């Protein structure tokens, strides 16, 4: 539930289809569990690290360039997985120790602070003319307050889902402020096929230096984040997922 917001927010910010993001997120998670032999309890969602390059490629060259870039990143993950399998996990952990991985994860979150603030302060943070909204700011503060309270005060299972509780509280507050429009939900069909973008049908894949230079180098950021996530997840579960089923399997499945 906590990942749902992020998985939907990234395609909204980048101009992609949230329905496709949810579908591929689910399929990708199933593939990940298959590759890792079902031993790592993880869910794959959208990565915030690629927001800026995807927006740039989408605006300059179209959605096809962004999709080709995503495919290249998957190849990079596969190559790194082969490298880890060949040299061992100790070598990669020596190259990316916790003192490096930790700040990388922090930078990813902090780099999105301006986006969060803009969405909390303005009626439409993507508009050319920004209109300040005290209502949005109040709801954002209510959501943040509930999330912090639940994270600090609540115990057991509820302490694990403060983001979900915060989102729920913020949504209820939005209802009282009258800014929730149910009409799109009422008008939407019960079942609808997502708006797929098919290569060689909707666009012709082209490999350019622009795509390579904008997408491939950034792969080191989510790879570092992935390694940190595995170490933290292992601590929580009391297992060493880096050794079993192995970091190479986890990286390959993530890619």
Set out the residue ranges of the language-model regions.
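Hydrophobic, membrane-embedded alpha-helices of multi-pass small-molecule transporters
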Residues: 1-3, 132-144, 161, 197-229, ...
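N-terminal signal-anchor module of multipass membrane proteins
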Residues: 1-41, 49-59
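Hydrophobic alpha-helical segments embedded in the membrane of multi-pass proteins
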Residues: 4-5, 20-30, 47-51, 75, ...
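Juxtamembrane interface elements at the cytosolic ends of transmembrane helices
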Residues: 4-8, 143-150, 161, 172, ...
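Generic transmembrane alpha-helix signature in multi-pass membrane proteins
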Residues: 8-14, 51-60, 90, 114, ...
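Short, non-helical or kinked segments that cap or interrupt transmembrane helices
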Residues: 16-23, 38-50, 92-101, 158-165
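Membrane-embedded alpha-helical modules
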Residues: 59-184
